[in-house]
Amino acid sequence: DGVFPETKKNPIEDLKFDQDQWFCYPAKVGDLLCFVYFNVAYMAQGVTLCNLFQLATEEEYRNRKPDMIYVYGYEDGKKHQYFYQDDENDMMVALLSANDEFDYFGYMKKMMLTLHNVRKINKKQLPVHGAMVQITLQSGETKNIVVMGDSGAGKSETIEQIKVYGAAYIRDLITVYDDMG
């Protein structure tokens, strides 16, 4: 259902991992660093992360504590989909169990956005769920467009339609941010 309850206990604290069955994608989620650990069974969702979240460089993650840790596809025979605010370590932690019901990229993306947004709110910052593009018109004039809304509201589709219907007028379109800023 895409609603992730908060738990008062770290959901990954006592978990055991076979390192041959897991990958880590160090994602840049806005200005935050998220280590996304995904089971090899969910490779399709894991590699798709690069379409939405830029891969952090080694310089950006080496010897640095992440702001968020997300374990996706843990084989526990349950349907866990929790997040935890680890105040002691100043980070967000999340777990999503391996389950056919969760075998969908939206579950990976939405939990990451939930962690990002809760962390930003806790830091007294306003998370933006939207996108911004900078358009250079054929005349050379530059315009910025921000599209905001709930999940499924049509933000990405709106930007795609701007590209299609504005093609004759647009010289260049640069995505400033997509999904959060």
Give a label for each model feature:
Residues 1, 117, 151, 176-178:
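Residue-level signal for functionally critical sites in structured catalytic/ligand-binding pockets
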Residues 1-143:
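A noncatalytic interaction/capping subdomain that flanks phosphate/NTP-handling catalytic cores
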Residues 96-97, 131, 150, 178-180:
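Fold-independent oxyanion-binding glycine-rich loops
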Residues 105, 126, 151-155, 176:
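Active-site-proximal structural scaffolding
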Residues 137-168:
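Glycine-rich phosphate-binding P-loop
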Residues 169-181:
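Short beta-strand-centered segment that lines the nucleotide-binding/catalytic pocket of NTP-utilizing
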